[in-house]
């Protein structure tokens, strides 16, 4: 939010910004009128929405994520890593994505690496932990590590970086969906707060991302979220068609053209992907939808029904990775 307040997009009105440590205290001050709006990471609201509603507050909108994806710090791209290369990642989702993308890697959490090597390491914060990983890499004790993009800019790293992006270079290549709520900031206020004011801080795409992720993920516990990859974004039809042509994706191309080849919509499109990967990376359950913006609320309801059917069918076929 600091970058937003320093940008040209920031409202012209004078804004008094305060930092708070606890959601409980902040909600009390929102309810009493001492505060007007609260901006917070959406992931911190997960599982606490009842507390928000009890304070007579609600999510008024959200900011579009700027840096949702992770970075691999290594001299080599993933496909060029040596056999049995050691990659550290504290994200269960990313470890599974890396195993899916490349066989033969030793993808470990920080805890596992410390235990295997019988070390005694303690870190005061995330910056110290990732600085330690960079030292391991420079000493050639590991081949690389995964770091959130937002933290990467704060750590002194001289090595090459490789972004883990959601769009494969070629159809069927490796892709990396972000964690649930990744870099998503929600704006919370009292019920019936003036929309004309809250809209100064929110974005339409951010609102869509929050609405769909909340609908799909709010009933999941923290453990379930650890293995879910998700992507929600607005797309221009021209951009999507260029991508479909590049990948020779006839299904996508035909979806937005009639029998005579004419475009059937000029609306902004909403793209939604969700997937769950087995611990060894060998199996993936995924769902992908692209719909016009005006139909995205109806589409997310039907998409969730389809997603639940996929999971139920996997359980019926004794695919055990659903709860691993």
Language model regions located:
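Short acidic low-complexity segments
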Residues: 22-28, 77-80
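Small-molecule-sensing regulatory modules
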Residues: 1-24, 96, 100-324
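Flexible hinge/capping segments at coil-to-helix
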Residues: 70-87, 101
